[in-house]
Amino acid sequence: MADVRKLKNYIDGEWVESKTDKYEDVINPATGEVLCQVPISTRAELDQAAVIAEQAFEKWSQVAVPRRARVLFSFQQLLIQHKEELARLITLENGKNLSEARGEVQRGIENVEFAAGAPTLMMGDSLASIATDVEAANYRYPVGVVGGIAPFNFPMMVPCWMFPMAIALGNSFILKPSERTPLLMEKLVELFSEAGLPKGVFNVVYGAHDVVNGILENEIIKAVSFVGSKPVGEYVYKTGSANLKRVQALTGAKNHTIVLNDADLEDTVTNVISAAFGSAGERCMACAVVTVEEDIADEFLEALRTAAKNVKIGNGLDDGVFLGPVIREENQKRTIAYIEKGVEEGAKLTVDGRETGLSEGHFVGPTILEDVTTDMTIWKDEIFAPVLSVIRVKNLQEAVRVANLSEFANGACIFTNNAKAIRYFREKIDAGMLGVNLGVPAPMAFFPFSGWKSSFYGTLHANGKDSVDFYTHKKVVTARYSLKGYEE
């Protein structure tokens, strides 16, 4: 292991060797190769970054908004120039195929583009006359030092929900990326610095519990953005809120897709395969459950099984591969345990992904479990893997009732050409992001990523106008200016 590179934290514009003696291997999940080692940094290092970020905030928040926006525009241009390199880094450490990685890079770039609109986004509003000689104006100001805690499954897109917008609006930022996918962030830091970002405005501290607790407890940090699992998200929200911080925690999901009798069969199967098994199912917008009307179920499921069995599995860097590995061996074992639990509880395993025939890497193939009921573990829990549960229903109303029983409410989709059915679905389903005749209803950067129920803890969501509100304070100034002496 002597020749394995050890990553460093990025504090005050410099790569700084961690003071910890604990490092974890960063593994290519497709091959098992150790790519580098990431430090499990100490609380003291997080606290140091907070002091630096606070000092940088004092200057950065005073930089004119158009000048801040120009740094973001430069960053966006550099990201475009390095798109392929960034995509390959994502595939190398995360495992998703190159096409998906390129799509993720593009989504990240779009978030930076949105953040570059800070001069417009920072605008307040005013009323010229609220009483005789009295006017009022509403101004936005940055909140201060912001902390971000990002997951492994979208190492570029999710952090780019966070730090570009926060920084464009005048805040400084400390990011804890996932220790499983840290290499991509190294490159983003390099490009952001090249774009002209001053030292200390953006800091990266790798780590685990101590760093997370530091972000949640350090008084310098005023707001925290989190994306990850429900248990951790609950902890982040409760702990951060108890320490008087603004917190947004985007957590788990169990997204349902409804297939009605009039759906275009071929198009629906293609979309469900992509939504359920793309990115190895490791995304909070994955299709986890299909509820299909009985009249079309046999035909639909026969086509779905055939398509699932024909999915090409392998290293995401190889041509033609659709399904890459899950992130770690423990995730692979956990997924297999869920599949076996489903069979034990009475589900019918019609496509079995437990054995892929690949000798290395952490792979689970497309898996379909049918005859699933809402009391089964595989229906209740977020599995976060390429495992799809299927429930037959009599009609749309039953499908909506089934979906609404879930504790999660991130996304939901419907496949139909019936306008009345679409309207019923829109009005009655409990979910924050809906798709009509598409499989993954992830919104663009200028709309909020708006999960409901146990999929989100907080008030203001990520992205869109919500993110502007989250990263800014408002001041309302009421002023009296008498016109005495200027009368005609």
Curated annotation (Swiss-Prot):
InterPro entries referenced in this protein's UniProt entry, alphabetically: Ald_DH/histidinol_DH, Ald_DH_C, Ald_DH_CS_CYS, Ald_DH_N, Aldehyde_DH_dom, MeMal-semiAld_DH, MSDH_GmP_bac
Biological process according to GO: inositol catabolic process; thymine catabolic process; valine catabolic process
Its gene name is iolA
Q: What does this protein do?
A: Catalyzes the oxidation of malonate semialdehyde (MSA) and methylmalonate semialdehyde (MMSA) into acetyl-CoA and propanoyl-CoA, respectively. Is involved in a myo-inositol catabolic pathway. Bicarbonate, and not CO2, is the end-product of the enzymatic reaction.
Q: Please list the residues that make up the active site.
A: 284
HAMAP family named among the record's database cross-references: IolA
What name goes with this protein? Answer: Malonate-semialdehyde dehydrogenase
Origin species: Listeria monocytogenes serotype 4a (strain HCC23)
Superkingdom of the source?
A: Bacteria
Q: Indicate which residues the UniProt annotation says bind NAD(+).
A: 150, 152, 176, 179-180, 229, 251, 382
The protein's annotated catalytic reaction(s) are: 3-oxopropanoate + NAD(+) + CoA + H2O = hydrogencarbonate + acetyl-CoA + NADH + H(+); 2-methyl-3-oxopropanoate + NAD(+) + CoA + H2O = propanoyl-CoA + hydrogencarbonate + NADH + H(+)
Q: What is its EC number?
A: 1.2.1.27
Q: In which pathway does it act?
A: Polyol metabolism; myo-inositol degradation into acetyl-CoA; acetyl-CoA from myo-inositol: step 7/7
Q: Which GO terms describe its molecular function?
A: malonate-semialdehyde dehydrogenase (acetylating) activity; methylmalonate-semialdehyde dehydrogenase (acylating, NAD) activity
Q: Which UniProt keywords apply?
A: NAD, Oxidoreductase
The subunit field of the Swiss-Prot or TrEMBL record says: Homotetramer.
User: What family does this chain come from, according to its entry?
Assistant: Belongs to the aldehyde dehydrogenase family. IolA subfamily.
